[in-house]
Each structure stands twice: as C-alpha cells, then as structure tokens.
Amino acid sequence: MGISSILLSALIAGGALALPAAEPVSFDIRDENITLARRAEAINYNQDYIASGANVQYSPNMAAGSFSINYNTQGDFVVGLGWQPGDANPITYSGSFSASGVGILAVYGWSTNPLVEYYVMEVHDGYQTAGTHKGTVTTDGGTYDIWEHQQVNQPSILGTSTFNQYISIRQSPRTSGTVTVQNHFNAWAQAGMNLGTLNYQVMAVESWSGSGSGQISLSKGTGGGSTTTTPTGPTSTSTAPSSGGTGAAQWGQCGGIGWTGPTTCVAPYTCKYENAYYSQCQ
C-alpha cells in the first residue's frame, strides 16, 4: 500500500502531515490471550506504514515494548508500537531520536465519530505548522502549542475522507518522559476540538523527507498530572485542579474528555479509566 507521488507532493507542499494509506491500516495482535482488563496496558498494536520506495529500517519488539528506526527517505512512513484501542492513560517513553530534515516523535492516533487524526509531538524537527493555532497547554514539565488543521479528501483509517487533525507540539523537544494524554484530550475539548471513539494509539516516528534514527521503549500507566490550558483570543486561562488538591470521593468522576473537575481521588481510592469520556474513583 502507498500514497501516490502526486498525493505525497500535495501533502508536503501544503504543510500537512503525512498520512496512512487510503485503505484501513491493519493491526497486529500477537497475544490473543490478553484479557480485556490488561489491554489498556499491554502493547498489542504494531503501526507499520511505509510508502513504496521509502528507505526505512524498522524493527519492532512488541514483547519488550520497544522499537528501533533508521531512515533516509523521500517517501512517507509512520511506524511505532501502541494499543488498539487507545485510551487517555499516560504513556511513558524513553530512548533516543535524532533527525536531519523532517523527523517527528509523537503519540499518534485516530478517533471515529468524528473522524480525527491526532498527535502529541515530543520532537518535531523540520515540521511546518498549518491550520489554526488554538492556544497552549502546560503539562508534563513543558508547554505545548495546540493546532487544528483540516485535511480534505485525504487518506484515513476509513478511506479517503475529510477530517480534522488535532496537534499538540511541545515547545522544548525531548526524547524521554511521560505524556499525560488525558491533559491533551481535555485541552483540545476546551478549545472545541472533540474526539470520538478512540481507534489505535501509538508512540510513533514519522517522516517524509530526510534521515534519522532512534530507539524507543514505551509503556502505559494510569492516572495523570495537573495542566494549564491557555486558549487563543480574549478568553481567560483555565487551570485544572492540581494532583495535590482535594480529590473526588468514592464513585466520583475523576477524568474524561472535557472533564475539568478533580483528577485524583481521596484515599484509599484510585482513579480508574472506564472510557475516553469517563474515569471513576474506585
């Protein structure tokens, strides 16, 4: 599968991110005995889109939760490991990544109803922003710029479609740390950028021009930290409660897309993820 040279040229010229192939991307579940209770944490998805002609050496190790990448390409690729389906739990990663030209290291995924392609970019070498700047979110020791960009008649997990991209771009790039995914989902929702049902979610490397290499290990945890969201325009700053503040009581809500209340629980309860829109103290 691949993107034609005409489409790839249009994507690069338009400043848009490279996309997966038009047909739905297949996923790889190596351990069919993974229970539903463990699927949120166990890596079960290998994203391995490499356009025809792209010079990419990608070596995933799902059991170890790591992958290596080496590329020198003018063709598009998106590769990485993660989860199907994705969720709002934090992702911790570590390793190395460097690029000359375009090189993106990001939490990457899709939702349906609405169809959305999303990124939390930790490294964004050579990437030119496009679309509308919607504000910033401060979380995980850094500040991210929030962008929304519309893709018209472009490849997606549902075939050729028109859809929006939600993009958080870290101002101070890093190659190790924790991405509190819930904080980005909340910040996007506050900016009117709502996700639907989550599809796959990976820690990915992407490029369509240049060279680079890296090795990344990743895992998924529970809970989350504090965040500050600053929308653009004449609106006020909204700050979610700190994890050190008063927590929600037993059976109270403690997370979810658009949730602005407590994100921790009073002792001895913990915040348990139920779905993208609701987490509960149990």
From Swiss-Prot:
InterPro entries: CBD_sf, Cellulose-bd_dom_fun, ConA-like_dom_sf, GH11/12, GH11_AS_1, GH11_dom, Glyco_hydro_11. Significantly inhibited by the wheat xylanase inhibiting protein I (XIP-I) and the proteinaceous endoxylanase Triticum aestivum xylanase inhibitors I (TAXI-I), but not TAXI-II. Glycans are attached at N33. It comes from the Eukaryota. It is found in: Secreted. Keywords: Carbohydrate metabolism, Glycoprotein, Glycosidase, Hydrolase, Polysaccharide degradation, Secreted, Signal, Xylan degradation. GO terms for molecular function: cellulose binding; endo-1,4-beta-xylanase activity. This is Endo-1,4-beta-xylanase B. The gene is xynB.
